[in-house]
Each structure stands twice: as structure tokens, then as C-alpha cells.
A protein has these predicted regions:
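An acidic/histidine-cluster motif and surrounding catalytic segment
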Residues: 1-99, 103-213
């Protein structure tokens, strides 16, 4: 898929395991096609309950004595994204757009993305197309609706973002402990060495969920 002269491959994460997840998969594909995405690669993720996954590592950043574990769903989500990054890393494209099945594009998103990709620096590693929790965090305005974020303050969320292939080996190397949800894990262990940007306001929403700005 050519967007602003970049060779961007859309990749969708889905689960084929229960009627609930199959319906989300079907509805997501339908929306993506209607939104102008026709060359989608679909990657089956890790279904935590079906795989018998139970994360044992603790996430204690917010409460050092809490002995908190993120649970089956977040652990499986982390592992699913790790699979996606490895799939992308062997494909020939220069950039990848990672999508969740409940991603919903705003009207005019593709035209806006074409415009904003001309504002983001050509050597970017990671671009949030959709995000949450960016409001109030320090950033640097680059141009148009493009903002750069630096450690330790980053947007959150994983419903739509573009990654340059050159960044994938670093992501794969640094995402090796499923103790924290995937987006938090990126902020803590991966983003400090990457050039991270966001389009604000975001171009996508999450189906049936109002995300904080």
C-alpha cells in the first residue's frame, strides 16, 4: 500500500478461537476494506485461554510491593504482538501499519495520513496514528499535526501505528519479557532508543470504547 510514497504493509491481528473473536475479526476486516485498505495481511494471535497461558512475571512499577501480574489477556496480547513483529521483519516492505480488529478509522483518515507523512521526518522509527494518554505529556511540535515524544513521556495504545522496518530488530530484541502490557513495555524498554512521533489529534478510534486523549 503506497501512502505518501512509502511502501506500507497493513497487518491485522486477529483471533480465530471463539464466536466473539471471529465476529470482531470479520467486522474489522469489513471496516478496513471500506476504509480503503485492500492488501491486508492477517496474523493469528495467541489466544491466552486456548493456549493455557498464565504470565508469572510481576509488574510492580506502580506499586513495588503489590506483586501484580497482568493476567492471561495482557500476556497473550504481548506475545501476539511479538509474533507480528517477527512476521513483519521477514517481509520486504519498508514500513508496516499494525492494526487491531477493533480499530476504526475516522472519516478522511487516509487523506490526512498522506498529508502528515510528509511532515514527519523521513528517518522516523515509530508513528502513532492512533493513540491514547498523550494529553499533557511533553512533546516537540514538528509540523502539521506531527509531534515528537522523548523518554520517559510517550503516548499509549496499540490500535494503529506505523513502524519502519529498520526499527523492528530493536523492537524484537527489547520486547523479551511479557511482564507488562505491550504498550507500556514499548515505552519502558524500546522507545528510548527510537525516534517516536504521533499524529495529534489521532486519526483512529477504538470500537465501543472511548479512549482518553
Amino acid at each position: 500500500m503506497k501512502i505518501a510514497d512509502l511502501d506500507i504493509q497493513p497487518i491485522m491481528l486477529y483471533l480465530p478461537d471463539t464466536p466473539y473473536w471471529v465476529n470482531r475479526w470479520r467486522d474489522g476486516k469489513k471496516h478496513f476494506v471500506e476504509s480503503g485498505i485492500t492488501d491486508l495481511i492477517e496474523v493469528a494471535g495467541v489466544y491466552g485461554e486456548g493456549f493455557g497461558i498464565d504470565g508469572t512475571h510481576e509488574y510492580n512499577l506502580d506499586n513495588p510491593t503489590g506483586h501484580h501480574k497482568i493476567g492471561v489477556g495482557y500476556t497473550a496480547g504481548f506475545l501476539s504482538m511479538y509474533v507480528m513483529y517477527n512476521v513483519a521483519n521477514v517481509l520486504p516492505n519498508s514500513h508496516f501499519m499494525f492494526l487491531e480488529d477493533d480499530t476504526r478509522f475516522n472519516d478522511g483518515w487516509l487523506e490526512k495520513l498522506n498529508l502528515e507523512l510528509q511532515n514527519v521526518p523521513k528517518d522516523f522509527d515509530f508513528l502513532f496514528v492512533g493513540s491514547c494518554c498523550a494529553g499533557g505529556k511533553p512533546n516537540t511540535h514538528i509540523g502539521g499535526d506531527i509531534y515528537r515524544f522523548d523518554a520517559p513521556y510517550y503516548p499509549m495504545g496499540g490500535n494503529c501505528y506505523i513502524v519502519a522496518k529498520k526499527a523492528l530488530p530493536h523492537i524484537i530484541l527489547t520486547q523479551r519479557d511479557a511482564y507488562a502490557p505491550a504498550d507500556i513495555n514499548l515505552c519502558l524498554h524500546t522507545f528510548p532508543e527510537l525516534k517516536v512521533y504521533a499524529i495529534l489529534p489521532r486519526l483512529v478510534e477504538q470500537n465501543n470504547n472511548i479512549l482518553p486523549k
